[in-house]
């Protein structure tokens, strides 16, 4: 995604990797 986060759960149309 636009934020380019980096944890374990891949979500969103951009495939952001975020903690969830």
UniProtKB/Swiss-Prot annotation:
Q: Tell me the function of this protein.
A: D-galactose-specific lectin, binds the T-antigen structure Gal-beta1,3-GalNAc.
Concerning its family, UniProt says:
Belongs to the jacalin lectin family.
One molecular function GO term is:
carbohydrate binding
Q: Where is this region: Disordered?
A: 1-20
Keywords assigned by UniProt, alphabetized: Lectin
Subunit text: Formed of four alpha chains and four beta chains.
The keyword Plastid belongs to this UniProt entry's keyword annotation: no
Q: What is this protein called?
A: Agglutinin beta-3 chain
Native organism: Maclura pomifera
Q: Which domain of life is it from?
A: Eukaryota
């Amino acid at each position: 995604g636009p934020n380019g986060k980096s944890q374990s759960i891949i979500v969103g149309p951009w495939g952001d990797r975020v903690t969830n």
